[in-house]
Amino acid sequence: ESWMKWSDKVISMLAFRPTWGITGNTGGASGWQYNKYSSAGYYNGHSVVQPSNLSLTNLKWEKTEQWNLGFNLGLFKDLITMEFEVYNKKTTDLLMTNQRISSANGFSSLGYVNAGTMRNKGWELNFSTAKFAKIGKFAMRLRGNISQNFNTVEEMNDLILENLNGSETWNPTNMSYNQRVQVNNALGSIYGLRSQGVY
């Protein structure tokens, strides 16, 4: 356009990339809606089978809705190129495995459960240069990346939270830190008690 003529020598490429989509994920949970049986040996001379799982008829696909807004910029005949993107991703019916249940059901855990809702949002910047210095067979170019992601557990069943959090004792043997899952915090956050001083 005529009103952009001033940019011809500076901006060699400019593009915007808005996207939106919804995806489903079974997370390996396919088939859990069926009752399965396995051999349990023999009884009174006859083969015996036993249930090997609980039928999970209410299990849903994990669903992720995401939007992205990005742009590509090239400067000085693409001597410098940049890509910038912001995103917001919400996952509902989050799939988690091996959640403990009362053994009165005949099993101590469920293979999969729909655990809650989690959100990831953030931004990312990539930049690079064309070959701007060349000496003989040696050439130089620069590339860089910087990004930031914010993760938040928005909803989760109290029983599942209890199962995930488990022990609250720091283990000095293998230097493992306490990780805790709490609503309105990042999944697997490292936590500790506030110090009142040394005495």
Question: What function would you assign to each model-found segment?
Answer:
Residues 1-185, 190:
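Extracellular/periplasmic, surface-exposed regions of secreted and cell-surface proteins
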Residues 193-199:
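Short, intrinsically disordered, charge-balanced linker/junction segments flanking boundaries
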